[in-house]
């Protein structure tokens, strides 16, 4: 399917926060409760529509283990957007956000759009991080913020699409040189009048989540 733009995303965060589950829910609209841990990097893609234009999202799901951080860092380059994910039931995953963000700021392009996602909001009875804390962290660091549930699909679509909307606005505002693919944006060849639809393409699972 033709697209007006292709945006490259990376999903980052600690092991077990649900990165792979978020990707699978977005691309395949299903939840897989038991996964093998992601080894290195896995990939998914899906078409969405923004401003009546078909946009292809190419999403790289990364391993959260420290031993894979060097591999993950290489994927920051050439990413237009990132989902930085923590688990609202595990305080330590929130505490590690600053380290992930430092990595992103150091290795990614300065205009990369970052969406902070507090995953597993379906387990709010086990909450260890308040909504306000997530919101405050995002505000302090210039991130977009949303709580989501890969299990129930709450806000999963919105997290990916809102990130794409912010990237698209930056293109409209002339922030990106779209001829430079190192920004994680590729100009496509959209067929006039064709809508992007919400059809999904291939994705592979991985990671561990509730």
UniProtKB/Swiss-Prot annotation:
Recorded topology in the membrane: Lipid-anchor
Motif interval(s): Effector region: 35-43
Recorded GO CC terms: endoplasmic reticulum membrane; Golgi apparatus; Golgi membrane
Keywords, comma-separated and alphabetical: Endoplasmic reticulum, Golgi apparatus, GTP-binding, Lipoprotein, Membrane, Nucleotide-binding, Prenylation, Protein transport, Transport
Keyword GTP-binding among record annotations: yes
Residue sites binding GTP per the record: 13-21, 61-65, 119-122, 149-151
Cited PANTHER family: DRAB11-RELATED
Name assigned to this protein: Ras-related protein Rab-2-B
Originating organism: Zea mays (Maize)
């Amino acid at each position: 399917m033709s697209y007006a733009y292709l945006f490259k995303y990376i999903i980052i965060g600690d092991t077990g926060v649900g990165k792979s589950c978020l990707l699978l829910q977005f691309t395949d609209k299903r939840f897989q409760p038991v996964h093998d841990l992601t080894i290195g990097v896995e990939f998914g893609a899906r078409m969405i529509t923004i401003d009546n234009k078909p946009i292809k999202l190419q999403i790289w799901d990364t391993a959260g283990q420290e031993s894979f951080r060097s591999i993950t860092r290489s994927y920051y380059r050439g990413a237009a957007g990132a989902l930085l994910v923590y688990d609202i039931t595990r305080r330590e995953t929130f505490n590690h956000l600053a380290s992930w963000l430092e990595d992103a700021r150091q290795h990614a392009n300065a205009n990369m759009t970052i969406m902070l996602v507090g995953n597993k909001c379906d387990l709010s009875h086990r909450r260890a991080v308040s909504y306000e804390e997530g919101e405050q962290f995002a505000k302090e660091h210039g991130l977009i913020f949303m709580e989501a549930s890969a299990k129930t699909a709450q806000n999963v679509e919105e997290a990916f699409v809102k990130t794409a909307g912010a990237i698209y606005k930056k293109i409209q505002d002339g922030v990106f040189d779209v001829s430079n693919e190192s920004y994680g944006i590729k100009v496509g060849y959209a067929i006039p009048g064709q809508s992007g639809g919400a059809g999904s393409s291939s994705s592979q699972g991985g990671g561990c989540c509730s």
